[in-house]
Amino acid sequence: MSKEAYFSGESIQLSDMLRAREERALRQLHLLKEYPEGSLLSVTMNIPGPIKTSPKLLEAFDIVIKAIQTALADDKICYQLRLLPTTGYEYYLITSLPSRDLKLKMIALETELPIGRLMDLDVLVLQNDLPHSISRTVLGGSPRQCFICSKEAKVCGRLRKHSVEEMQTAISKLLHSFFNKDNQSSSSDKTG
């Protein structure tokens, strides 16, 4: 499948992204204040470039959301919200699970799911009356790796080490491999 199959959505402007980030931060703050006893999970996708949505990206997003819901099946979920703006898909969940435990489950999910690397599974807490993300490194996890060179993703991002084209190609290959593997296992389940 071509790269265009995964990046076929509407192109957005930087101003749209900045507005979406601001709205997301306000939504996170509101949820943390509305559910002070709960833990907040905020899910977005790591999609470089001006196209953040497409049918295939939504399919991948929804697979991860379903995996999250399955991972938290034994925990009380107080609130869920799934948003599909052109600036990128968003999912919010409040659970009674302590934030540290929630983050550990999300790190495991990011690691176990081949497409988990495409997601930001942020667990947020209020700190000085502002949303603050719990870092995987604080809990003993290793920093996220770059899709392309396997170095620390934040460093590659900060240095703009890889072009949008390179990153989209790597994401397309990852998704193509995931969907083909998923289809093959579904086919063998039906024939076996």
From Swiss-Prot:
Taxonomy, superkingdom: Bacteria
EC number: 2.7.7.61
A Pfam family of this chain: CitX
GO molecular function: holo-citrate lyase synthase activity
Catalytic activity field: apo-[citrate lyase ACP] + 2'-(5''-triphospho-alpha-D-ribosyl)-3'-dephospho-CoA = holo-[citrate lyase ACP] + diphosphate
GO process terms (BP): prosthetic group biosynthetic process
Record keywords: Nucleotidyltransferase, Transferase
Coiled coil feature spans: none
NCBIfam families: citrate_citX, PRK01392.1
Family: Belongs to the CitX family.
Stated role: Transfers 2-(5''-triphosphoribosyl)-3'-dephosphocoenzyme-A on a serine residue to the apo-acyl carrier protein (gamma chain) of the citrate lyase to yield holo-acyl carrier protein.
Protein name, per record: Probable apo-citrate lyase phosphoribosyl-dephospho-CoA transferase
Organism: Streptococcus pyogenes serotype M5 (strain Manfredo)
Gene: citX
